[in-house]
Regions:
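Bacterial N-terminal signal peptides
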Residues: 7-17
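A glycine-anchored, Pro-Gly-centered beta-turn/N-cap motif
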Residues: 48, 110-112
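Short amphipathic, basic-aromatic surface patches that mediate peripheral association
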Residues: 55-66
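Short acidic/polar inter-strand loop motif in beta-rich domains
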Residues: 83-85, 121-129
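Short beta-strand elements
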Residues: 130-142
Length: 142
């Protein structure tokens, strides 16, 4: 029994260095991410791109693949809920990546009700720990 327990402890210890490499990047507890424009419940004209401005406090913005303390890059979520916080943020038309360190973008959406939310990702597009995300806002394109 002792040999079995010792073997299990040894095997688990071999996994520890690997588990530490892929974990989320730490974020300060007072980090604050927000959408500066458009405003919640704002009506925007259809057929015309509009600016989305990203705001971040108590952290910095760095391009993807740059691992530096207290930095990350923006992901704009359109008409979706937050993804799993322990996995890479999807990259599709509802999860826009700004891996060059952008702090604003132009978006054009079809007429209707839409939601926008920001999520900060680390150098590997994984949400920080604790996750840093904005309030979800609603906009209307008419």
């Amino acid at each position: 029994m002792f040999k079995l327990l010792a073997a299990a402890v040894f095997a688990a210890s071999l996994l520890l260095p690997v588990a530490g490499l892929g974990g989320p990047t730490a974020a300060p507890p007072n980090a604050y991410l927000y959408i500066g424009y458009p405003n919640n419940n704002q009506v925007l004209p259809a057929g015309k791109p509009f600016k989305v401005w990203f705001g971040l406090r108590n952290m910095g913005v760095a391009p993807k693949d740059v691992k530096y303390p207290n930095t990350g890059h923006h992901h704009l979520l359109i008409d979706v809920d937050l993804p799993p916080m322990d996995k890479e943020i999807p990259n599709d038309r509802n999860h826009l990546h700004f891996g060059a360190g952008e702090t604003e973008t132009m978006v054009e959406l079809p007429p209707g009700k839409h939601t926008l939310q920001l999520l900060l990702g680390d150098d590997k597009h994984i949400p920080t720990n604790p996750p840093v995300y904005s309030k979800k806002i609603t906009i209307y394109v008419k």
